[in-house]
Amino acid sequence: MTDQSRAQPQTATSTITGIFALLTAKPGVTRERVMAIMPAEIRATVKLYLEGKIREWYAREDGRGAIFLLNAKDVAEASSIMESLPLAHEDMLDHQYIPVGPLMPLGLLLGSPPAKQ
């Protein structure tokens, strides 16, 4: 399930270029349960990548999940993408979403005034 309360707020002045989705196995979910669904999860993930919805993905070093960089305009779109995957259908993962965009202070190098917050 998605925990929207942990999502970072989005401001109207920011430019969102992607959404990080941090997926963590829920407490009590065993490796065996995850591995039983993993072939379908991998196929679905590759399909989303080939459709341009997933830009990058990584395994978490702690072995508890994955981190995706999604081509999504907002958290709602990112959530829709992640909820389409088999492990989400089985309610095995917690999701956290973090919108990201350009490092706005770099505009100072171009002589642009900083965006007002």
Predicted regions span which residues?
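Conserved, structured core segments of small domains
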Residues: 2-117
